[in-house]
């Protein structure tokens, strides 16, 4: 167990170190100054910086990150449901799953190359236009930059799989969690900057002590939001840990002088069987239209359509709503619907009612008042669908709540802090679900080993 934890920590340290190795576009200081200017003026760039775990601000080789692997996973899982041969392969035990995983890796490689080229084109033409970085790029720098970013993406994918196989928890989710947590100091700094002001008054804390130079309205807003965030965190943990227990009885069997069976076991069905994957898939899927729009504008190919895609799929807020009207609602509404769709989709992959029903029938198990076989399969599907309906709606509501907070805060002139809250909402779901998954696996592994092995 100790070796697993140390292996995970070592991989995470290397991953965060690589997130600060710049691509060979220009001098590192020149790149960082240009990207800092970009992130203060471009909302899309700020969102990409979050998803890359801060790699964008340094133009690091980990800029593309896990995005190609996530996209390839979504494509392969959709093909698994659409193509009967692949569905049979996915049900063919460990060997079938290994072949599908290998195809996913092979698909991620060309996607990483394409995304690396697209990122550089977008950054060069849109985000870094007017800077010396955009005008001094040679063909050699193009080749080296694309190669470095593709290699970084493949290394990140390999690290995630190593954590999954040799470590604790889901490696891809854990690396995304680490990337989001790395942005926490910057988010807290933004909130503190919004709270402090030159003409601020002393803020008394229960008459115990006072903090000078605070804007009272912003401070009370932050306190209220902190309380609301804790309540959302509590609700998220409850929803994630909620489950339905189905009792399974086993018929008695006599073999010689021995009697088998006659016992009762349970099938725990979680409220959100899919875990955090629907949120990750929804965020990755929603980033594609804006990404494509930026690429179209950069290449001047159907620029009007590209600008519309950027407009329609930017993160909605009260500030953008004043400019774009109904278009500001497209992102949060699409986000809510995609979370529900991907929750159902991934649940159908993770929880196979037919396999469970067949396994129970072969072992002589049955659910009370439900006949084995087809009736058991139908009953399990009914229970899972009802739980998934409630769980997906709850997860979707939690996901879009920060957008409501952003809308309210923007009315008080706190748009910058509101943007941080909106990004933090997606991050909160990923962090909580990923942490609970790690804790669950730690507990299960701790029960499987002796004291000497645990040490």
Give the residues covered by each predicted segment:
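N-terminal cationic and glycine-rich segments that engage phosphates or anionic surfaces
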Residues: 1-88, 95-455
């Amino acid at each position: 167990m100790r070796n697993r934890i140390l292996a995970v920590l070592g991989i995470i340290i290397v991953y965060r170190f690589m997130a600060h190795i710049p691509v060979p576009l220009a001098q590192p200081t020149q790149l960082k100054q240009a990207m800092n200017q970009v992130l203060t003026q471009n909302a899309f760039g700020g969102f990409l910086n979050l998803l890359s775990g801060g790699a964008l601000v340094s133009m690091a080789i980990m800029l593309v990150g896990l995005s190609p692997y996530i996209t390839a996973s979504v494509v392969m899982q959709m093909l698994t449901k659409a193509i009967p041969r692949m569905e049979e392969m996915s049900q063919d035990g460990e060997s079938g799953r290994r072949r599908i995983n290998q195809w996913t890796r092979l698909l991620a490689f060309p996607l990483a190359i394409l995304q690396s080229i697209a990122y550089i084109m977008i950054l060069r033409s849109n985000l870094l236009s007017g800077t010396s970085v955009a005008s001094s790029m040679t063909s050699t720098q193009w080749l080296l930059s694309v190669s470095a970013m593709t290699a970084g993406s493949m290394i990140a994918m390999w690290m995630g799989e190593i954590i999954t196989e040799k470590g604790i928890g889901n490696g891809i989710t854990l690396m995304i969690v680490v990337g989001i947590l790395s942005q926490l100091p910057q988010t807290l700094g933004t909130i503190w900057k919004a709270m402090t002001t030159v003409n601020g008054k002393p803020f008394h804390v229960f008459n115990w002590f006072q903090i000078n130079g605070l804007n009272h309205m912003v401070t009370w807003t932050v306190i209220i939001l902190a309380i609301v965030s804790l309540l959302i965190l509590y609700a998220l943990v409850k929803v994630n840990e909620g489950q339905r227990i189905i009792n399974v009885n086993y018929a008695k069997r006599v073999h010689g002088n021995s009697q088998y069976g006659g016992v009762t076991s349970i099938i725990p069905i979680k409220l959100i069987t899919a875990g955090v994957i629907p949120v990750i898939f929804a965020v990755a899927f929603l980033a594609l239209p804006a990404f494509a729009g930026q690429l179209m504008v950069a290449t001047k190919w159907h620029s009007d359509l590209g600008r519309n895609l950027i407009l329609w799929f930017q993160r909605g807020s009260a500030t953008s709503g004043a400019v774009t009207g109904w278009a500001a609602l497209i992102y949060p509404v699409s986000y809510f619907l995609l979370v529900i769709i991907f929750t159902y989709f991934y649940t159908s992959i993770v929880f196979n009612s037919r396999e469970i029903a067949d396994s129970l029938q072969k072992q002589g198990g049955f659910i009370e008042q439900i006949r084995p076989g087809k009736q058991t399969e139908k009953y399990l599907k009914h229970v899972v669908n009802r739980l998934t309906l409630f769980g997906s709606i709850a997860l979707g509501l939690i996901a879009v709540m920060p957008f409501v907070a952003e809308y309210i805060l923007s009315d008080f002139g706190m748009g910058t802090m509101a943007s941080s809250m909106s990004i933090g909402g997606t991050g909160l779901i990923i962090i909580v679900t990923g942490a609970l998954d790690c804790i669950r696996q730690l507990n299960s592994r701790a029960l499987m080993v002796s004291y000497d092995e645990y040490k």
